[in-house]
From Swiss-Prot:
An example Gene Ontology molecular-function term: ATP binding
Family recorded in the similarity comment: Belongs to the activator 1 small subunits family. RfcS subfamily.
Name of the featured protein: Replication factor C small subunit
SMART domains: AAA (SM00382)
Organism of this sequence: Aeropyrum pernix (strain ATCC 700893 / DSM 11879 / JCM 9820 / NBRC 100138 / K1)
UniProt-listed CDD domains: AAA (cd00009), HLD_clamp_RFC (cd18140)
Length: 325
């Protein structure tokens, strides 16, 4: 392979046109209408990471402009280039350049637009008005509420949903078989649980795990540096049985063996609290979720990982005794 990008499966298997996108059908059908009409408004793509927002923008540009679409598309990552000067200079210069044949506009793609400063967004709003005859803007955001109302009102809104388990696993299976990777079906399930509908993350995990040989559940959790769900459930079950010391030992083992932060452990605990495989009264499950929220907040604020998570296990142990679990 001639470049690093060609070695990355997430790039190798990225859809090139709208016809190649098998998910987000409600979005794709509307975008195809823009291609058919050879015209489009400003667009705002919103949704969680890895759901195909940037891919859809590139596929739309490809179908409008052809193989050389990149010369008619200015792509900026707003989280890296938030300043008002970027908006005023780069976008203004590109907007004034020549338009492609047959299509009367070019495209400015602003990825992570929700990270732009308020001043930069105000400047963008004015540029959108000034160059709307020759330029269309596609804004990509994880949190559309951070986009100022005057910009939102000028855009057609598209919400990208987290990908279904079936869509993610089918894609992973296709890639694994195409690359000649030996894998366990349970490992694909584990990758989906870890990625939470983020296709980009899922493909990257699959590729990383493939370097260890057969893609197994153990290999998957090893490459992402996460504890296996059964290990977290064992820790919680031990606390529920009233053995705080043993539960805390399991906590220490998890954090040291996997190098996990307190926030990472808290997120895994939260996931396992709602697992049907963890047996606990519904009342305690609700109370535990509420208390874990407080622990997570303190961890985010910088509190000590070991102290906060040990406190959670101590609380769980005491509550289980009180409720006679």
């Amino acid at each position: 392979m001639s470049s690093v990008l060609e070695m990355l499966w997430v790039e190798k298997y990225r859809p090139r046109s709208l016809d190649d996108i098998v998910d987000q059908k409600h979005v794709v059908e509307r975008l195809k209408q823009f291609v058919k009409q050879r015209n489009m408004p400003h667009l705002l793509f919103a949704g969680p990471p890895g759901t195909g927002k940037t891919t859809a923008a590139h596929a739309l540009a490809h179908d409008l402009f052809g193989e050389n679409y990149r010369q008619y598309m200015l792509e900026l990552n707003a989280s890296d280039e938030r300043g008002i000067n970027v908006i005023r200079e780069k976008v203004k210069e590109f907007a004034r350049s020549r338009t492609p044949p047959e299509i009367p506009f070019k495209i400015v793609l602003l990825d992570e637009a929700d990270n732009m400063t308020s001043d930069a967004q105000q400047a963008l709003r004015r540029l959108m008005e000034l160059y709307s005859s020759v330029t269309r803007f596609i804004l990509i955001a994880n949190y559309p509420s951070k986009i100022i109302d005057p910009i939102q009102s000028r855009c057609a809104f598209f919400r990208f949903q987290p990908l279904s388990k079936q869509d993610v696993i089918e894609r992973l299976r296709y890639i694994a078989e195409n690359e000649g990777v030996d894998y366990e079906e349970e490992a694909l399930d584990a990758i989906y649980e870890i990625s939470e509908g983020d296709m980009r993350k899922a493909i990257n995990v699959l590729q990383a795990a493939s370097y260890l040989g057969k893609v197994t559940v153990d290999a998957v959790y090893r490459v992402v540096g996460m504890a296996k769900p059964r290990e977290v459930r064992e820790m919680l079950a031990t606390a529920l049985k009233g053995d705080f010391t043993a539960a805390r030992s399991l906590l220490r083992k998890i954090m040291i063996e996997y190098g996990m932060s307190g926030e990472d452990v808290a997120r895994q605990i939260h996931r396992e609290l709602f697992s049907t495989e963890l047996k606990m009264p519904e009342e305690l499950r609700v109370l535990a979720a509420d208390y874990l929220g407080e622990v997570h907040y303190r961890l985010v604020e910088g509190s000590d990982d070991d102290i906060q998570l040990s406190a959670f296990l101590a609380w769980l142990t005491m509550m289980s005794r009180k409720l006679e679990v």
